Curated annotation (Swiss-Prot):
Protein name as catalogued: Outer membrane protein P5
Species of origin: Glaesserella parasuis
Keyword 4Fe-4S included in the entry's annotation: no
Additional information: On a 2D-gel the determined pI of this protein is: 5.5, its MW is: 32 kDa.
UniProt remark on domains: The extracellular loops are most variable in sequence, and in some bacteria confer sensitivity to phage and/or colicins.
């Protein structure tokens, strides 16, 4: 997942 979107993707993909 893009680290630039880690705040958003992290909640969904855990990355």
């Amino acid at each position: 997942a893009p680290q630039a979107n880690s705040f958003y993707v992290g909640a969904k993909a855990g990355d």
